[in-house]
Amino acid sequence: MVILTPAEELGLSGLSLDSRLRKAFYGMPAERVTEIAARLNAEAKALDMCYWRDGSADTIHILMRPIGVMPDQLAYLNYVSLTILNALKRIPDLYLQDFAVRGIVPLTPPEEKWLWDTWTPSHRETNPVLGRLDAVVEFTSPMWKDSLRFMEPNLCGVGGMHLGPACERLLADVVMPAVQEVDPELQMEPGQDFREIFIQEVLDHLQAIGRAGQNIAFIEPKYSNQGTDEQEPLAQYYRERHGLTVVHADPSELRIAGGEVMYEDCRIDVAYRDYEVRDLIHLEEQQGVDVEPLRMLFRQNRMISSMAGDFDHKSCWELLTDQEMTQKYFTAEERQIFRRHILWTRVLSDRRTMLPDGEPGDLLKFVGEHHDMLVLKPNRSYGGDRVIIGYATDKAEWDREIEQALADSEPWVVQRG
């Protein structure tokens, strides 16, 4: 007799749930599926779930079949994610005190000046970071915990704040009633509404820094007409649901008056940004935008994410998978989480380092010989830009990509796939 661990039993429960969902969809008449798809599309359009391209809005397509997650699985994901996020929040202080850290997560000189000018003891006490950690996991596997792998952090201007909760609500309101027509006993509910989690974090942060007001600014390239359109629907949600004053601003629309940051006639108490600091520097240097209001918000710890958000380099994972660094800066419990769930990642360069097997070795030699298990990525790019998947390339092409990455003025990372 084989005795399963609780985690294995939970994974098999996830498999059973997934099987019931599949069976329910197989049992639906084709016309019912077509009806659901049409309604999802109409509801998504009504909720401004759009992606803008060159001034034209495309409604985002929602996949109908939900992914089922057991409560204990969700709790474990939260535990691991918060452990990693809290470690990442400490990187600005590590950067300021350790030159080795600066080599792994380098800032440009103007970015570093922003850090020195705006990072204060207040940030060490309460450090607001809104992040998304990109990961893969197989909930239906008996070994589902071991399948959880974090690929990279996104700690500034993350997408999905409006789209995620809206999508879950549509699945609950449109799809699940149809599923229960086939399987009445199958009960599923949406996860916690991220919009509510976020606004509570904002209000808690205002209280922690002693700021009495609750006027919030969402700051993004307001007039770009490119990408997702989330901040205005999100602002409208908070106005209607919570009665909060929430404004939607472009950086050029902020000013300082009487020692306060203002948008039109509204005093700003806290701001959420969809800009990296290097983008703000570009606005100042290339377009002449006055970014002093934003610098003030950073300095007074009234910007979400703090400067910690600008350390969401893919090379962060080297800090968390290098034994020398983790022994120096992180607890045994944190190190265990990192070893189990974070993909081995290194800044690509000609050096010796700890390899995935735990032994020191020549990095470039290892990368050249093991392309079938590795991925190359620009360190600070996003959106799948120039990601090279080793097993999808031949050896000659892989070697060319390595040479080009080493010659690039911007750092690249290599990661175990």
Identify what each model region corresponds to.
Residues 1-417:
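Preference for protein termini
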